Swiss-Prot record:
Main location as per UniProt: cytoplasm
Keywords: Aminoacyl-tRNA synthetase, ATP-binding, Cytoplasm, Ligase, Nucleotide-binding, Protein biosynthesis
Top-rank taxon, per record: Bacteria
Entry function: Catalyzes the attachment of glutamate to tRNA(Glu) in a two-step reaction: glutamate is first activated by ATP to form Glu-AMP and then transferred to the acceptor end of tRNA(Glu).
Matching PANTHER family: GLUTAMATE--TRNA LIGASE (PTHR43311), GLUTAMATE--TRNA LIGASE, MITOCHONDRIAL-RELATED (PTHR43311:SF2)
Protein's UniProt keywords contain ATP-binding: yes
NCBIfam families: gltX_bact
Similarity annotation: Belongs to the class-I aminoacyl-tRNA synthetase family. Glutamate--tRNA ligase type 1 subfamily.
Motif residue range(s): 'KMSKS' region: 245-249
Organism: Rhodospirillum centenum (strain ATCC 51521 / SW)
Gene: gltX1
EC number: 6.1.1.17
Name of the protein in question: Glutamate--tRNA ligase 1
GO biological process: glutamyl-tRNA aminoacylation
């Protein structure tokens, strides 16, 4: 069996990290197994779906490096859904219902007030032809429900283990709206059968939906003479750092927002691939590495929490491992046309975001007001500063001479030099940064002048 999985977002908002977990888990599963990855837009919610959100989803996937083998758009497949509906009607598995949304809400409220589950009472099945004709004469148009067969619905979930539902505890799902358009529960199953999806890996908020869809898969396979029931896996949903739920409309956790904040795609994928698993969370330098290490069996059942600080740590790890050639064009996009390998190697260990390189470029090349605490110390350091050209040994020789002249050592030696040369208490190693600053600028700063 060739593994086939899918990522099927609705273009009704920006992708967030919860969506990323679904996309990445499916992508890694497919690549590890040598299978195929389908990117499908579930865009039948025409009121809320927009081309802008569809384009943003594609942009996010490309930014992450999650390529796809096949693409589908549900709005292109209405004719296929009509055929599936006709087959289910012929099989007697769909029935028309005429309750309004208000009437259904009243039924639901009444059941809940009695402490009973809000399961649809199948009142529509008791309507006769005359009743239906009368309701339609009043202007009502039916929505169509899928009739669940009585009995136990079971599957072996790759993450949750054995799952079991009684059909009597579930409402017959609405598959067709009053205007004739199909709903997700139907379109998703039809697509999964047509594209021969072997594994459906998604969030645990779909578990009850899966129970319904298992019967729908079976009914369609019977009615159309093809297809079967895929293997299911339901992973826990991600919470925020404080345990709060996430939404794709929560802007701070959207992939676009994270990208704009300077998050590296490999850092994000490394974090999300390991979050909630038994693996240590460390950065990987390629998606191929993540795929080779991926194992669905390592995914736990507890609720993982998304920690921005942990992501920042991995972001730094990814940047610190990048050669200059990998970031050269991105540095140019930041306006650092003169950046070279020496600059990158000097500042790389101190970056948590690539944009931080701009700050250190300005330290090395732009006017800066130094911080001088002891003018005599700074004057001695300036007097002892060697002539250029400078090499790797220049910093050590210079600081040794300053130490001998002033008696300063340790922090009392190095911090005043750093403040004078960079106006900062922390930063890249000065033995690599000093040659970038240059002797002329260094002398001016040691004398207290802006340079």
């Amino acid at each position: 069996m060739t593994v086939a999985v899918r990522f099927a977002p609705s273009p009704t908002g920006l992708l967030h990290i919860g969506n990323l977990r679904a996309a990445l888990t499916n992508w890694l599963f497919a690549r590890k197994a040598g299978g195929s990855f389908l990117f499908r837009l579930d865009d039948t919610d025409e009121e809320r779906s927009t081309p802008e959100f569809a384009a943003a989803i594609e942009e996010d996937l490309r930014w992450l490096g999650l390529d796809w083998d096949r693409f589908a758009r549900e709005s292109d497949r209405y004719g296929r859904y009509d055929a599936a509906v006709a087959a289910l009607k012929r099989a007697g598995r769909l029935y028309p219902c005429y309750e309004t949304a208000e009437e259904l809400a009243l039924k639901r409220a009444a059941l809940l007030s009695q402490g009973r589950p809000p399961i649809y009472d199948r009142a529509a099945l008791r309507l006769g032809d005359a009743d239906r004709a009368r309701l339609e004469a009043e202007g009502r148009r039916p929505h169509w429900r899928f009739r669940l067969e009585p009995g136990e619905i079971v599957w072996d979930d790759l993450i949750q283990g054995h799952k079991s539902f009684q059909a009597a505890d579930l409402s017959d799902p609405v598959l067709i709206r009053e205007d004739g358009r199909p709903l997700y529960t139907l379109t998703s199953v039809v697509d999964d059968q047509d594209f021969a999806i072997t594994h459906i890996i998604r969030g645990e908020d779909h578990v009850t939906n899966t129970a319904v869809q298992v019967q729908l898969f079976q009914a369609l396979a019977e009615a159309e003479g093809q297809g079967g029931v895929p293997v299911f896996a339901h992973f826990p949903l991600i919470a925020g750092a404080e345990g709060e739920g996430l939404s794709k409309r929560l802007g701070s956790f959207s992939l676009r927002s994270l990208r704009e904040q300077g998050v590296e795609p490999l850092a994000l994928c490394s974090y999300m691939a390991k979050l909630g698993t038994s693996d240590a969370i460390e950065a990987r330098l390629s998606l191929a590495e993540l795929a080779a290490e991926f194992d669905l069996a390592r995914m736990g059942r507890g609720t993982p929490r998304f920690d921005p600080e942990e992501l920042a740590r991995l972001n730094a790890q990814v940047l610190h491992a990048q050669p200059f050639a990998a970031v050269q064009e991105r540095l140019r996009a930041l306006g650092l046309d003169g950046a070279d390998d020496a600059f990158w190697l000097a500042v790389r260990p101190n970056l948590t975001r690539l944009a931080d390189a701009l700050d250190w470029w300005q330290v090395a090349h732009a006017p800066l007001t130094p911080v001088i605490g002891d003018t005599a110390f700074a004057a001695a350091a300036a007097e002892l500063l060697p002539s250029e050209p400078w090499g790797p040994e220049t910093w050590g020789a210079w600081t040794a001479a300053v130490k001998e002249r002033t008696g300063a050592k340790g922090k009392a030696l190095f911090l005043p030099l750093r403040l004078a040369l960079t106006a900062r208490e922390h930063g890249p190693e000065l033995k690599t940064l000093l040659p970038l600053i240059g002797r002329e600028r260094a002398l001016k700063r040691l004398s207290g002048r802006t340079a």
